[in-house]
């Protein structure tokens, strides 16, 4: 009886692991397929799309190095979904309208999507190499509140593997306090391959951070930042930031659009200042 029971338990456990592994492979296959579509639709970003595809092809084998719980796999899947959706939006060059163009060339564009709403796209060049920008945005993520006036605090709630994080972000009140206190709980994933980095995210839930008194729990995503060296100038970084946020509450769309586009412009300005100080300029 005991050997039979053991075999039954082992079979159930094996089947569970097969199912979890299948989810991992499905995530990698989905991203690879989406990137293939993007490469066919758009010739502009085909180089970095190919680089990310090579990175995602390693996803299944790398994830299998350590078994994850169902909750952890859920976070990984959410991060991959944010990555896939973001790349799909950025890969479609049609329908973008210019919101603002700064004197230094910084540009904010927008687009209305049926299933997402209005999204914003920032395109800037940072006079620092990719490694330095990546380190500031990823490795020093919890220090963002020190230099970004739109952010009060970023806290990492949980790490899942090497590339997935769950974070809590508290937004700083904008001038005039036209938008009340907001906070976010997000799942973030990063993919880096060669000279291309993609940082994607979307809203999620986490037991360690229920809705906080005095804050409206807003939602974001899909969002993503794409970093790659500026063509012909590897000491500079081309940064593209896709922003999609639902601030919740009763706010006129004109105010929301103004706040979000200005948030992107301010981010670029303060990121440059932060990078210049770090480089001793």
Swiss-Prot record:
GO MF assignments: cholesterol binding; cholesterol transfer activity
Subcellular locations according to the entry: Mitochondrion
InterPro entries per record: StAR, StAR-like, START-like_dom_sf, START_lipid-bd_dom
Positions of transmembrane segments: none
Predominant subcellular localization, coarse grouping: mitochondrion
Tissue specificity of this protein: Expressed principally in steroidogenic tissues as ovary (granulosa from the largest preovulatory follicle and stromal tissues) and adrenals.
Residue ranges of every copy of the START domain listed in the record: 67-280
CDD domains xref list: START_STARD1-like
Pathway(s) it belongs to: Steroid metabolism; cholesterol metabolism
This protein's GO CC annotations: mitochondrion
The organelle targeting sequence, given as a residue range: 1-63
Keywords: Lipid transport, Lipid-binding, Mitochondrion, Steroidogenesis, Transit peptide, Transport
Swiss-Prot/TrEMBL GO biological process terms: cholesterol metabolic process; intracellular cholesterol transport; regulation of steroid biosynthetic process; steroid biosynthetic process
Cell cycle as UniProt keyword: no
Cited SUPFAM superfamilies: Bet v1-like
Keyword Transit peptide attributed: yes
Reaction(s) the record says it catalyses: cholesterol(in) = cholesterol(out)
Stated role: Plays a key role in steroid hormone synthesis by enhancing the metabolism of cholesterol into pregnenolone. Mediates the transfer of cholesterol from the outer mitochondrial membrane to the inner mitochondrial membrane where it is cleaved to pregnenolone.
Subunit structure: May interact with TSPO.
Annotated protein name in UniProt: Steroidogenic acute regulatory protein, mitochondrial
Organism (species): Gallus gallus (Chicken)
Encoding gene per record: STAR
